[in-house]
Amino acid sequence: MNAQKPLELILARNLLSSIPTPAFLVGEKGELVFYNEAAGALVGRRFEETGKLSAEEWTTEFGPFDENEQPIPYLQNPATTAVRENRPYHGNFRICAAGGNHQDIAASTIPIVGPGGSSGAIVIFWAVNEGGKPA
């Protein structure tokens, strides 16, 4: 039987479903809980195809990747550190986009904190070119 999701995650998912900017929702343990249609278009797979993924699964498949094209482990990602400290984070990353091509992105991470403490994070991202400008 599935445990009830925190209300703040349910509301965050509803918000992400209604915005045109690529975004995903990460749960308290780093699992990929949801990503919207715009994110699915960028990575080449709809959320309905992947479903919920563990932190290890989604970082291996989608990234972020380092300069040698190796996945950055979830716990070594600076955005993860910030969220665990209930701080927002913004940075540039490389992900695996549609067709297996790597794409540079800018990403902003916002922690979600409810009555019971941290529930996860919202990550909003967009493609950027080599100069860091939106692509």
PLM regions with names:
Residues 29, 68, 99, 115-116:
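Residue-level recognition of short loop/turn positions
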Residues 74, 102-104, 120:
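Beta-strand residues that line the small-molecule/cofactor-binding core
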Residues 25, 64, 95, 111-112:
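Hydrophobic beta-strand positions
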Residues 2, 111-135:
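Sensory coupling linkers of modular signal transduction proteins
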Residues 29, 33, 37-41, 47:
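PAS/LOV sensory domain surfaces, especially short acidic/polar patches at coil-to-helix junctions
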Residues 11, 50-97:
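Terminal output helix/cap of sensory domains in signal transduction proteins
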Residues 90-94, 104-107, 122:
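PAS/PAC sensory module
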Residues 2-31:
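Sensory modules in modular signal-transduction proteins
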